[in-house]
């Protein structure tokens, strides 16, 4: 039974600095990529809006009836 207790007991050695840095960098790249895709989407929508406005397909002026 003494061997079972030694195997089952987890020893906390403290935080791993290298592991924490790798986690931080990975999380930063993932969130940064999502943020960049969000901005690319906004840029595309703005460009499409101004292209349609220039072609005359849409208007920002309300038509009177």
UniProtKB/Swiss-Prot annotation:
The chain crosses the membrane at residues 20-37. Keywords: Membrane, Mitochondrion, Mitochondrion inner membrane, Transmembrane, Transmembrane helix. The keyword Transmembrane helix applies. It is found in: Mitochondrion inner membrane. It comes from the Eukaryota. One of its GO terms (cellular component) is mitochondrial inner membrane. This protein is one of the nuclear-coded polypeptide chains of cytochrome c oxidase, the terminal oxidase in mitochondrial electron transport. Belongs to the cytochrome c oxidase subunit 5C family. This is Putative cytochrome c oxidase subunit 5C-4.
